[in-house]
Amino acid sequence: MTDQNFSNLVPVNIEDEMKVSYLDYAMSVIVSRAIPDVRDGLKPVHRRIIYSMYEAGNHASKPYRKSARIVGDVMGKYHPHGDSAIYDSLVRMAQDFSLRLPLVDGQGNFGSMDGDAAAAMRYTESRMAKVSHKLVEDIDKETVSFNPNYDGSEEEPSVLPAMFPNLLVNGSGGIAVGMATNIPPHNLGEVIDACCLYIDNNDIEILDLLEVVKGPDFPTGSMILGISGIRSAYLTGRGSIIMRGRAEIENIGNSRQAIIITEIPYMVNKARLVEKIAEMVKEKRIEGISDLRDESNKNGVRIFIELKKDVVVEVVLNQIYACTQLQTSFGVIMLALKDGLPKVMNLKEVIAAFVSFREVVITNRTIYLLNKARDRAHILLGLTIAVSNIDEIIRIIKASNNPNAAKQELMARSWDALNILPLVKLVDDKAMLNEQGKCSFTEVQAKAILEMRLQRLTAMEKNKLEEDLKNLATEITEYLNILGSRTRLLEILKEELIKVKEEFATPRLTSIEFGEFDQDIEDLIQREEMVVTVTLGGYIKRVPLSSYRAQKRGGKGRSGLSMRDEDITTQVFVGSTHTPMLFFSNIGQVYSLKLYKLPLSNPQGKGRPMVNILPLKENEHITNIMPLPENQDEWDNLNIMFATAKGNIRRSDLLDFKKIQSNGKIAIRLDEDDKLIDVKPCKEDEHILLATKAGKALRFPVESLRVIKSRTSDGVRGMKLAKEDSVISMTVLKGISSTKEDRDAYLTVPWEKRLEIAKGEEFNLEELGVTLTADSILEMANSEEFILTVTENGFGKRSSAYGYRITDRGGSGIINMDINDKTGLVVGVMPVKMDDELMLITNSGKLIRCKLESVRITGRNTSGVILFKLDDGEKVVSVSLIAETSESEEDSELEEDLEQAEEVYT
């Protein structure tokens, strides 16, 4: 290398050169490759493909052309990069599962949702989609600026004059240097409606825009869970949207069910999804699937998942959601180029940028059309003058030596324009008038006169010239109005948007499931009805309800659990695996637990000690378990009513027990010789019925008690008790507004007739023999409740709640049941419905279920009928109700056993 060569070198600091070069590279990637423009929603490669197809005449109305030719044109004229990058972009624009409105109409294999690659470009054919013409419409009217291509041989548009907000409609995704964009597709109709709202009110709130833009609308359909991610994305430009595939449940015979997946989340590979499900089944992370196959075809997605018998389908589906991409998230980053710079924008800013751009496009188009109209009017004015002075025009032309001389002579003369002055003023063409008010031809007009055909000399053509001038004058006036009035310009903008909506809008594909869907372990727990059994020794278990047989009244029952004589069942209730429960202990402490966390057992199993489940202190044991509504919104209007064996009661807010730490909290203060009998949720308009083991009962309104905020209070006296008597149950009843006289009169109607009236059957008021009105009887029949009373010797009865008069708390009560040595003491009192089932458990562990419709309805002061045949020394220790459940397979198999069950009436 010579010294002269070294003299041309410029020394630079490598650190500075790295900074400058890397920044140049980064900006090139951001501006020229990876980030879309907010105005037309396109990256340079997509814009070049569409413009190249438009320029080549590869329109939607024309035949398809080989994709290879299109790629070659784009690469040779505008995009000097690899052909594969161009073809991949073209393929994506043709995929109806990638774009909400495909911009390319492809013919051939353009890939699939399984991740299959498109056929080679030499095999596929393409043309512009019909909607793509709305992106390039008016591009020939100087609406957008053009820049030289990479070698200066061609010009390409810097942006397309898009007539709809393509950035939102089709979305975009890309990774640049130090930044990325990920914009989901939306519904065209919703986005255009939002644009119209913004045009009407530029100060509109983003939340108001959310009223019409419900959320992304993915081409693959599926569902969006919750709206918090949508709100965050639209308010800040960033957010995470949870997508979930759509699944249906089908019965396929033999008591089997199948999950049919018909829609999958956006950009999820269907083949990989099926493989992932199979992997999870093999690893036993998803259980209950017996067969899996992909039955998708040209009509849509169909993934068939056959389930094993007796599997809870919801649990399997939740496992699939948790372990696979059937539920996934879409991270929204609404980053786009605005004024040439990358910016994260919210929904309103994106819409505002598009509307502002369309204003510029319409303004530029109007200026272009105005200039064209004025140029045309200028020529027509010259032709009109020439026709009016045709003899002189012909003479000048004949006398001229050549066309140029004729043109100069025409331009040099002044022509009388009195007869066309109105037309000159109409088109606002002042260039023709000289100081004397006469007209002189311009060079353009003179040339047009020389090129005029002889047919223009007819009277019809003269009238047509004047008509054309008037039409042009109308157009010019309209263009000037548009340019002079932003209101008019916005009207046109809205009209054009609405036309696009009417032509291309389609119904929403993606549904929005409102509410929050933070999936936790509970979503993977089978929702199943369980019988919870608690023993005196502190053991607890849950057993599937289907494990017990339904028997008729008087049946001998079956063994429910095997226990020692000193360990008897104290509480039984039925609930879902997702039922929240409050555990109240003998020392007034309360704990919280979900039912599915209890040990699963069988009817003969003993369960587990509660001390191993709850953090109980020494000498502490659970005395009462209170199941609650699964929906905590239902807790707002509920109170908790405490009742103790000594007759004390206390009313508290249920919300005071909403948040309970794992180590529990104080619920109520108890005297040493007292114990907690029951705790129930109640409302202010309801009544409380306290019942004692000696057959007494007291009814009073909940509202007669004030809410006690102190959790350390022992409450107030609820019922005055006789010596050796104690409260054994507390029942919550509906409040009633009828008088005692009306209730007594109503109770004279036979109970069979009252039940018929409650079922809607017609009745004859005179035949009933009461003084009540028909409306009163109907109202009381529909509101009537029945109280079930059960004794330790297996006797029971149902009585109308209307027979229990309302008194003040603190009294001794009234007779609830006539008890004697035969019946034994009362062990349970509760409200029941006609379709309920009764569950009884004895101190020997024997259990029976019977339909309450077979239990006689009598007055309060009766002894009832035998419900349960007891062995010597056997006593009923627990009573519980089971709501009517759907008939299971096991119930069907026991139909014969139920019919043969013994019935005993006394």
Curated annotation (Swiss-Prot):
The active site is at Y123. One of its GO terms (cellular component) is chromosome. Its EC number is 5.6.2.2. It comes from the Bacteria. Residues 35-524 form the Topo IIA-type catalytic domain. A motif (GyrA-box) lies at residues 551-557. One of its GO terms (biological process) is DNA-templated DNA replication. Its main location: cytoplasm. InterPro entries: GyrA, GyrA/parC_rep, Gyrase/topoIV_suA_C, Topo_IIA-like_dom_sf, Topo_IIA_A/C_ab, Topo_IIA_A_a_sf, Topo_IIA_dom_A, Type_II_DNA_Topoisomerases. Residues 886-906 are annotated as: Disordered. It is found in: Cytoplasm. Keywords: ATP-binding, Cytoplasm, DNA-binding, Isomerase, Nucleotide-binding, Topoisomerase. The keyword Signal does not apply. GO terms for molecular function: ATP binding; DNA binding; DNA negative supercoiling activity. Pfam families: DNA_gyraseA_C, DNA_topoisoIV. It catalyses: ATP-dependent breakage, passage and rejoining of double-stranded DNA. Heterotetramer, composed of two GyrA and two GyrB chains. In the heterotetramer, GyrA contains the active site tyrosine that forms a transient covalent intermediate with DNA, while GyrB binds cofactors and catalyzes ATP hydrolysis. A type II topoisomerase that negatively supercoils closed circular double-stranded (ds) DNA in an ATP-dependent manner to modulate DNA topology and maintain chromosomes in an underwound state. Negative supercoiling favors strand separation, and DNA replication, transcription, recombination and repair, all of which involve strand separation. Also able to catalyze the interconversion of other topological isomers of dsDNA rings, including catenanes and knotted rings. Type II topoisomerases break and join 2 DNA strands simultaneously in an ATP-dependent manner. Belongs to the type II topoisomerase GyrA/ParC subunit family. Few gyrases are as efficient as E.coli at forming negative supercoils. Not all organisms have 2 type II topoisomerases; in organisms with a single type II topoisomerase this enzyme also has to decatenate newly replicated chromosomes. This is DNA gyrase subunit A. It comes from Rickettsia felis (strain ATCC VR-1525 / URRWXCal2) (Rickettsia azadi).
